UniProtKB/Swiss-Prot annotation:
Residues 144-163 are annotated as: Disordered. GO terms for cellular component: HslUV protease complex. SUPFAM superfamilies: P-loop containing nucleoside triphosphate hydrolases. This is ATP-dependent protease ATPase subunit HslU. GO terms for molecular function: ATP binding; ATP hydrolysis activity; peptidase activity; proteasome-activating activity. Gene3D superfamilies: 1.10.8.60, DNA helicase RuvA subunit, C-terminal domain, P-loop containing nucleotide triphosphate hydrolases. ATPase subunit of a proteasome-like degradation complex; this subunit has chaperone activity. The binding of ATP and its subsequent hydrolysis by HslU are essential for unfolding of protein substrates subsequently hydrolyzed by HslV. HslU recognizes the N-terminal part of its protein substrates and unfolds these before they are guided to HslV for hydrolysis. ATP binds at residues 19, 61-66, 268, 333, 405. Keywords: ATP-binding, Chaperone, Cytoplasm, Nucleotide-binding.
Length: 455
């Protein structure tokens, strides 16, 4: 992350996609900026400064997950979102919490590999074109030229070579312009190693994955001739050439460093592994998961197939609705590891109006763009937008509060007929008015039983 990404810049970027929730945006912006600040310190102090993990508290659909997702994109950091309910205490059937870090490393390796391939794109593209040109214009064989043209002057051989090079360049330009995209050729490609299914005991996913890698590596690099269009052949050849040009060991080393220094783990549904205040006694599946999370959040060393990972400087963002349980129902040790608490507010009508209109790729803009592909110009009156927001808010209040996700349900119902008939519509300019919204959604909202199942 560069120095340019100040907390204000980060918040401004988040506001392009997320409406409201300024406290949460500020908290994550400061946490991200502290990453950069830490990297400016001397080595001794840097090791002592650990990230201040965040606990987001708020109902579903108010932006908790979206904030974390956008933050990871801004930071260009390895990011993984997991649900706390998917894990069980070590020794019980199910995934153990250390698999979070292993999955995070896999994400980082994939990310760094893509970055490395991007750097060699130009060279890989050139090599891929050469492979295609070798098929289209096979180079003259050396042995043939020695036998067949023993008395041929050196000048003639040179001019033939020059002519061949000119022809190749003409065809190279045709390939680059896409003029030969649909022409079929036969090209030699690497055969993907067969994946061997390994059945392992529950919770031993890492071991089974390593065994699969071992069996795959035992299979020799086989090649086979495959018939395909030049367009597809270029893409395949470019991927193969890029894979040869990148240094896998360097990728792994950089991925491990990225995880240790900049990794972000988003723990969703943390409230679902809380012990309810009213319950007495320990709950193995719930409290055990929290106790297993403690070493990860506090800082420990996890073994992965790429190497050892220290979790001391990984940022953990936990979130939960806390409808039934309270944050104080988390075990005290875990509460202490989540020092920054941010409460996200429920969405009001005004928030729904802004969500429909303001984000860069708002719901309305998405539907307008989708209909545009059918030649339909869709527009919404201001009063109609407010009416949609009011309906979404009302259904949330009366049925179940699912936050901004309710807007998707309402919009799908509202535009169902238009979406279905779009290809055959004669009138291509459609303006959504308040009357249209009332006609399509009015009865459903009034009838609570219907809205419960349809909206």
């Amino acid at each position: 992350m560069t120095q340019i990404m100040t907390p204000k810049t980060i918040v401004h970027e988040l506001e392009r996609h997320i409406i409201g929730q300024n406290d949460a945006k500020k908290a994550v912006a400061i946490a991200l900026r502290n990453r950069w600040r830490r990297m400016q310190l001397d080595n001794e102090m840097r090791q002592e400064v650990t990230p201040k993990n965040i606990l987001m508290i708020g109902p579903t659909g108010v932006g908790k997950t979206e904030i974390a997702r956008r933050l990871a994109k801004l930071a260009d950091a390895p990011f993984i979102k997991v649900e706390a309910t998917k894990f069980t205490e070590v020794g019980y059937v199910g995934k153990d919490v250390e698999s979070i870090i292993r999955d995070l490393v896999e994400t980082a390796v994939k990310m760094k590999r893509e970055e490395a391939k991007e750097k060699v794109t130009e060279k890989a593209a050139r090599l891929a074109e050469d492979r295609i040109l070798d098929v289209l214009i096979p180079p003259a064989r050396t042995s043939e030229s020695k036998v067949g043209f023993a008395n041929e002057p050196a000048e003639d051989a040179a001019s033939k070579k020059e002519k061949e090079n000119k022809t190749r360049e003409i065809f190279r330009k045709k390939i680059q312009k896409g003029e030969l995209d649909d022409k079929e050729i036969e090209i030699e490609v690497a055969v993907a190693p067969k994946t061997i299914g390994v059945m392992g005991p529950p919770g031993m996913e890492d071991m089974t994955s390593q065994l699969q890698d071992l069996f795959s590596s035992l299979s020799t690099d086989k090649k086979k001739n495959k018939k395909m269009r030049i367009k597809d052949a270029i893409k395949l050849a470019q991927d193969e050439e890029a894979a040869k040009l990148v240094n896998e060991e360097d990728i792994k080393a950089r991925a491990l460093e990225a995880v240790e220094q900049n990794g972000i783990v988003f723990l969703d549904e943390i409230d679902k592994v809380c012990r309810k205040s009213s319950n007495s006694g320990a709950d193995v599946s719930r409290e055990g998961v929290q106790r297993d999370l403690l070493p990860l959040v506090e800082g420990s060393t996890v073994s992965t197939k790429y190497g050892m990972i220290k979790t001391d400087h990984i940022l953990f963002i936990a979130s939960g609705a806390f409808h039934v349980a309270k944050p104080s129902d988390l075990i005290p040790e875990l509460q202490g590891r989540l020092p920054i608490r941010v409460e996200l507010k429920s969405l009001e009508i005004e928030d729904f109006v802004r969500i429909l209109r303001e984000p860069d790729c708002s719901i309305l803009k998405q539907y307008i763009a989708l209909m545009k592909t059918e030649g339909v110009d869709l527009s919404f009156e201001e009063d109609a937008i407010r009416k949609i927001a009011e309906i979404a808010y009302k259904v949330n209040e009366e049925v179940e509060n699912i936050g901004a996700r309710r807007l998707h349900t309402v919009m799908e119902r509202l535009l169902e007929e238009i979406s279905f008939d779009a290809p055959e519509l004669v009138e291509k300019n459609i303006n959504i008015t308040t009357d249209y919204v009332n006609e399509k959604l009015g009865n459903l909202v009034k009838n609570k039983d219907l809205s419960q199942y349809i909206l």
